């Protein structure tokens, strides 16, 4: 594939660092915000509401890299080398933010890295805040497909995450049988580990600006109060997206939605 030369990569990295830190000011007590959730769960939206913080997102780096190369992100060009380079750039942004004692928002779907970061940053005087994005897995899946049809690259990330961790099984949160799961297996496991390690956390329902649960709240009451989406509404939305994909000649999107509908019908 087309790629930047070594000196061009250095220029690109410096530009990304400068853009990430632009307009941000140091903090006497800097905070590291870790945002956790599957693709399509609203992490980027929540990140945009946190003031005066350097956002670290490999997905954003990859998108900017594609623009620099003049590649259409719809072609899903990302390969392993691009992913590694995005990690290198993200690390440079992180080091610059820490050096300047700036607040940091860590936006990622790579869950295994998050605990490492939460353990690492306090050494540099950072307090940590863990924010979990709770979203119905079918809602997230359709968000991702819709974003792909809006020329976003999220579909491939979502597919990779689901292939790695698989579909959730059972009913871990005690949901009613006519509704779909509210967390993926990966995020659920992450939450359990976070609690075991003693990390205070906040849980956000999709589309809400304020947390629905904070450490110390009654978790059972939180579960009872969740605003679940009936399967019928998922199926209605899926049909609309299928028609849109069909009319646009997007065969891959159409087949993805067909498979999603089949699974929803089986769980209805």
Name the predicted role of every residue range.
Residues 46:
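Hydrophobic positions on the alpha1 helix immediately C-terminal to the Walker A/P-loop
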Residues 38-39:
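The conserved Walker
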Residues 1-26:
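N-terminal pre-Walker A segment at the start of P-loop NTPase domains
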Residues 122-145:
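Conserved phosphate-donor/acceptor-positioning beta-strand/loop module used by diverse small-molecule
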Residues 22-30, 97-98:
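Phosphate-binding P-loop
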């Amino acid at each position: 594939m087309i790629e930047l030369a070594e000196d061009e990569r250095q220029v690109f990295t410096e530009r990304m660092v400068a853009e990430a830190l632009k307009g941000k000011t140091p903090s006497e007590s800097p905070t590291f915000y870790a945002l956790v959730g599957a693709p399509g769960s609203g992490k980027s939206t929540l990140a945009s509401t946190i003031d005066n913080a350097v956002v670290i997102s490999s997905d954003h780096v990859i998108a900017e890299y594609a623009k620099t190369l003049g590649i259409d992100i719809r072609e899903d060009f990302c390969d392993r080398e691009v992913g590694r380079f995005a990690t290198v750039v993200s690390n440079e942004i992180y080091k610059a933010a820490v050096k300047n004692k700036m607040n940091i928002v860590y936006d990622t779907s790579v869950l295994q890295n998050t605990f490492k970061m939460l353990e690492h940053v306090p050494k540099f005087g950072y307090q940590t805040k863990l924010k979990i994005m709770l979203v119905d897995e079918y809602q997230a899946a359709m968000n991702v497909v819709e974003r792909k049809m809006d020329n976003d690259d999220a579909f491939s990330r979502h597919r990779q995450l689901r292939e790695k961790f698989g579909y959730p099984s059972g009913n871990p949160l005690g949901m009613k049988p006519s509704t779909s799961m509210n967390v993926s297996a990966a995020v659920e496991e992450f939450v359990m580990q976070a609690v075991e390690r003693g990390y205070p956390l906040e849980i956000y329902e999709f589309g809400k600006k304020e947390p629905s649960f904070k450490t110390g709240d009654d978790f059972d009451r939180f579960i009872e109060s969740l605003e679940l989406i009936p399967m019928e509404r998922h199926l209605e939305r899926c049909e609309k997206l299928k028609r849109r994909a069909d009319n646009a000649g997007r065969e891959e999107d159409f087949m993805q939605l067909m498979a999603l509908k089949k699974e929803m019908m089986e769980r209805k």
